[in-house]
């Protein structure tokens, strides 16, 4: 029989008492009164803050948006199908934040920064708030470096600078996303990180964009944030802020970033849905009163940082869809007033075969030539003027039967200039190729060709220049100026190529 020794028992009890560590936690809790349509009403949660994350019993996370006298309105980050009336909810004391790191490059994630491409978890040790304050006035500097899109019409006449916000606006199916994806493709080798945010898009459209980027090797420097049309409204509302937080992470590390929001009007619709379900008073077009602030606080985060902060930049290209060309609707006018210019895509131009269908007459960049290299300024000034005169003459020529020779020549030149602005999708041009193309058109070297031959001639000229006169590209890229030497090389190449082209056509 084992003898029980009293001193051993007392030692064990003493050890247990010493090891006992009772943590006292104060948890702010509440009870679910009602749940449905992605909204929950909670009784209790007296200490909760606006925008604070709350956790439901079964694990769903929500954001406290409405703080009323007798209940709290919470929007759910998920379907919330397992939440029951009477179940408990606790405040977390945190506001929405996401992990950030270099490991996100090349991945497709959702609004909570969770990977959705089936390639495993993403390791990150740092966190950023989804909604952080935009840089102040002292933290910024004016935009002065170009962000090349690879599209002649934009880079020559509506230039975009690093740190600018430029709206891409137009009807559905006019090539808005194509302009944005071409811009991403053109950043290859430019040391620019790209973030593409798809809000409420069809999953097939997002898959198509991702496939294009993968095929062209652009996913290496791109992050795709996707919340498709079947996602809860809360996640569609958060997705752009998640994208902005990821872009900011790189911007504050002295890198250049480009973020594309496709499109903020879908975000506004998701926010309208949430607001109406929370019983907030509706305003114009049933949007809540703070829908302007929804977009302004997002787009103000795009900036060119001052030299003391490392001169990083975040360029934003929001895409807004209009209904039959109506730019005076609520969301388009809001975003136009927040951004530094807009690129207007016209359905009529698109249907008449002018692609990209950019209406140069009403598109504008409020940064202007500050966002162009000197060489581009030297050749592009003439282009916009000639195209504007051509548009005016073309309208007049419809009514006039007999036109003098000078007017006929001007119309012929205008048709060829319009032709050189056409580009195939996913075929952005380098700035050197653009300068060569514009110079050829504005100096009358295309006037002797038929309109239908212009594109073929330009493609062959680019190839000829690259193989036989590589010094031209070197001069432009090193000096950023269209020097006399570069002009002489270009004239020589154009002359040689014109002779070859005429012989080919005759043969």
Swiss-Prot record:
Pfam name, any one: ATP-synt_ab_N
Keyword terms: ATP synthesis, ATP-binding, CF(1), Chloroplast, Hydrogen ion transport, Ion transport, Membrane, Nucleotide-binding, Plastid, Thylakoid, Translocase, Transport
Reactions mediated catalytically: ATP + H2O + 4 H(+)(in) = ADP + phosphate + 5 H(+)(out)
Membrane-related topology note: Peripheral membrane protein
Signal peptide bounds: none
Plastid among keywords: yes
Main localization (coarse): plastid
Keyword Chloroplast: yes
InterPro entries cross-referenced by the UniProt entry: ATP_synth_asu-like_sf, ATP_synth_asu_C, ATP_synth_asu_C_sf, ATP_synth_F1_a_nt-bd_dom, ATP_synth_F1_asu, ATPase_a/bsu_AS, ATPase_F1/V1/A1_a/bsu_N, ATPase_F1/V1/A1_a/bsu_N_sf
Subcellular location, record wording: Plastid, Chloroplast thylakoid membrane
Annotated GO MF terms: ADP binding; ATP binding; proton-transporting ATP synthase activity, rotational mechanism
Enzyme class: translocase
GO cellular component: chloroplast thylakoid membrane; proton-transporting ATP synthase complex
Site residues, Required for activity: 363
Enzyme Commission number(s) of this protein: 7.1.2.2
Residues annotated as binding ATP: 170-177
Record note on quaternary structure: F-type ATPases have 2 components, CF(1) - the catalytic core - and CF(0) - the membrane proton channel. CF(1) has five subunits: alpha(3), beta(3), gamma(1), delta(1), epsilon(1). CF(0) has four main subunits: a, b, b' and c.
Matching NCBIfam families: atpA, PRK13343.1
Family as reported in the entry's similarity comment: Belongs to the ATPase alpha/beta chains family.
Name of the protein: ATP synthase subunit alpha, chloroplastic
Taxonomic lineage of the native organism: Eukaryota, Viridiplantae, Streptophyta, Embryophyta, Tracheophyta
Gene designation: atpA
């Amino acid at each position: 029989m084992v003898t029980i020794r009293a001193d051993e028992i007392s030692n064990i009890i003493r050890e247990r008492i010493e090891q006992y560590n009772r943590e006292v936690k104060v948890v702010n809790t509440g009870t679910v009164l009602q749940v449905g349509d992605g909204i929950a009403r909670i009784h209790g949660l007296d200490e909760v803050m606006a925008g604070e994350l709350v956790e439901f019993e079964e694990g769903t996370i929500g954001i406290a948006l409405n703080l009323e006298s007798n209940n709290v309105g919470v929007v759910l980050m998920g379907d919330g199908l397992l939440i029951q009336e009477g179940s408990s909810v606790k405040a977390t004391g945190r506001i929405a934040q996401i992990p950030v790191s270099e490991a996100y490059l090349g991945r497709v994630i959702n609004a909570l920064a969770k990977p959705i491409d089936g390639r495993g978890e993403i390791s990150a040790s740092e966190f950023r708030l989804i909604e952080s304050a935009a840089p102040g006035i002292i933290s910024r500097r004016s935009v002065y470096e170009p962000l090349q899109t690879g599209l002649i019409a934009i880079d020559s006449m509506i230039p975009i600078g690093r740190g600018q916000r430029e709206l891409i606006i137009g009807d559905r199916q006019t090539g808005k996303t194509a302009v944005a994806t071409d811009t991403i493709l053109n950043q290859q080798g430019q040391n620019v990180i790209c973030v593409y945010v798809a809000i409420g898009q069809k999953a097939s459209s997002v898959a198509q964009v991702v496939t294009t980027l993968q095929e062209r090797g652009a996913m290496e420097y791109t992050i795709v944030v996707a919340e498709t049309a079947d996602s809860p409204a809360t996640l569609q509302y958060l997705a752009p802020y998640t994208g902005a937080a990821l872009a900011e992470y790189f911007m504050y590390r002295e890198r250049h970033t480009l973020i594309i929001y496709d499109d903020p009007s879908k975000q506004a619709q998701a926010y309208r849905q949430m607001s109406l379900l929370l019983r907030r008073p509706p305003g114009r077009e049933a949007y809540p009163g703070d829908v302007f602030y929804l977009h302004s606080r997002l787009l103000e985060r795009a900036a060119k940082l001052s030299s003391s902060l490392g001169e990083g930049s975040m360029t934003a290209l929001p895409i807004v869809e209009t209904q039959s060309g109506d730019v005076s609707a609520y969301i388009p006018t809001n975003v136009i007033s927040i951004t530094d210019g807009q690129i207007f895509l016209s359905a009529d131009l698109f249907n008449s075969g002018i692609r990209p269908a950019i209406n140069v007459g009403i598109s504008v960049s409020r940064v202007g030539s500050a966002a162009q290299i000197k060489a581009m300024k030297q050749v592009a000034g003439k282009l916009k003027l000639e195209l504007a005169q051509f548009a005016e003459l073309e309208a007049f020529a419809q009514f006039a039967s007999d036109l003098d020779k000078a007017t006929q020549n001007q119309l012929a030149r205008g048709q060829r200039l319009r032709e050189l602005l056409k580009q195939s999708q996913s075929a952005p041009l380098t700035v050197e190729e653009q300068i060569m193309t514009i110079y050829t058109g504005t100096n009358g070297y295309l006037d002797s060709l038929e309109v239908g031959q212009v594109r073929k001639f330009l493609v062959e000229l680019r190839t000829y220049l690259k193989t036989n006169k590589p010094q031209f590209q070197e001069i432009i890229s090193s000096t950023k100026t269209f020097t006399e030497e570069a002009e002489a090389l270009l004239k020589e190449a154009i002359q040689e190529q014109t002779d070859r082209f005429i012989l080919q056509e005759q043969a």
